[in-house]
């Protein structure tokens, strides 16, 4: 119910994966489905009592940026009107950190369909930037001695983003001509 409300509320293009992730096999089916639909960024929606471990592994296995958000409890019966999606979001963020996985988590990741639609709109430029940078190819000029930290440290962050780096050593021309 909640996913459909989010899709209806969000103004942009949004593919709704029909697979509900309850275990690792479901996670694999969901990834197969979104890859088949040629999605290059994901919003992983944590409902109440969701299995955070398989949902967290999506970030590990998907080749693109992922954002994690969670359902707000609406009945007001829980403490401060908050239900189990908030707890699941905490478990998810802990799981991501333990596994050294990168994912985007909004400042307030638990919300209603309207809130989450806004979070998705805010995520789109982040996802575009991550996709653009990770597809970037940089050609640097050297030589850069491998043990000279000051030369190599600035590119570590680029490697972590998946940027392809090629180093061209500039030395003597192999064949020089004078005309």
Can you say where each PLM-predicted feature lies in the sequence?
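Single conserved hydrophobic/aromatic residue that forms the stacking wall/gate
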Residues: 1-2, 168-179
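Short, solvent-exposed amphipathic alpha-helices that sit
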Residues: 3-6, 87-91, 150-158
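Hydrophobic, Leu/Ile/Phe/Ala-enriched alpha-helical segments that form helix-helix packing faces
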Residues: 3-10, 96, 127, 158
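Short beta-strand elements in bilobed, periplasmic/extracellular small-molecule ligand-binding domains
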Residues: 6-23, 102-108, 164-167
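Long alpha-helical, hydrophobic tracts
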Residues: 16-29, 151-153, 157-160, 171, ...
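Cofactor- and metal-binding active-site motifs of prokaryotic enzymes
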Residues: 20-134, 145-146
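Charge-patterned, long linear interaction tracts outside catalytic cores
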Residues: 127-167, 171
